Regions:
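N-terminal targeting signals for export/organelle localization
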Residues: 1-51
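A short beta-strand-turn-helix
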Residues: 45-48, 53-74
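Hydrophobic/aromatic anchor residues within beta-strands of the central parallel beta-sheet
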Residues: 54, 107, 135-136
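Short active-site neighborhood of thiol/selenol oxidoreductases, capturing the structured segment around
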Residues: 63-86, 92, 107
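Thiol/disulfide oxidoreductase modules built on the thioredoxin-like
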Residues: 70-71, 128-133, 139-176
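Cofactor-binding loop segments of dinucleotide-utilizing enzymes, especially the Rossmann-like FAD-
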Residues: 77-79, 110-112, 161
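Structural microenvironment flanking redox-active thiols in thiol-disulfide oxidoreductases
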Residues: 86-130, 140-147
Length: 176
């Protein structure tokens, strides 16, 4: 009986699509990919380069695009299963709640490296549970992360108002 139940559960789980419970929508990217980020201790060769433009689904399966609108962008690439990301999100949300987002800046969380077999799946529930108030985008096949040169989590990419890379950073940002 136990073996039969385990087989039935396994068949049910394996027949679910890999993206079950995730927002739906196509990810599109235009422009040249950034080089992979080498790390904080190396000069970032992407500084000053134009960032790739992209469109992807948000938590409601609405397509959101990164585009020139006069605002600088702080892109926060997150993995729902990453312990450092799980620490970063509430700290950043607390800063947003306490200090606010500066005028002329958008903070965009990009959920990537999504794995339904790991904790905090689906990522939109995790971000909702954390009270995330800013834009959420879902990089369903890690295409955006790859185009932005991701190599670790959390991964920040700061863009000026013309969507050129100012700086990239991995790891948690100090609260101060």
């Amino acid at each position: 009986l136990v073996i039969g139940l385990a087989v039935a559960i396994g068949v049910t789980l394996s027949s679910e699509p890999l993206d079950a419970g995730l927002p739906e929508g196509e990810v599109t990217i235009s422009g040249d990919a950034l080089p992979e980020f080498a790390g904080q201790n190396d000069m970032d060769i992407a500084s000053g380069l134009p960032a790739p433009l992209f469109s992807a689904p948000n938590e409601n399966s609405e397509i959101v695009s990164i585009e020139k609108n006069g605002n600088a962008k702080a892109l926060l690439f997150l993995a729902h299963w990453c312990g450092y990301c799980q620490t970063e999100v509430p700290v950043i949300q607390n800063l947003i709640n306490t200090v606010g987002v500066p005028n002329g800046v958008e903070i965009i969380a990009i959920a990537t490296s999504i794995d339904r077999g790991r904790e905090n799946y689906p990522p939109q529930k995790w971000l909702s549970d954390e009270g995330w108030s800013e834009t959420q985008i879902y990089d369903l096949n890690r295409e955006i992360g790859t185009a932005y040169g991701i190599n670790a989590f959390p991964y920040w990419v700061f863009l000026d108002k013309d969507l050129n890379v100012v700086v990239r950073q991995t790891g948690n940002i100090p609260e101060e």
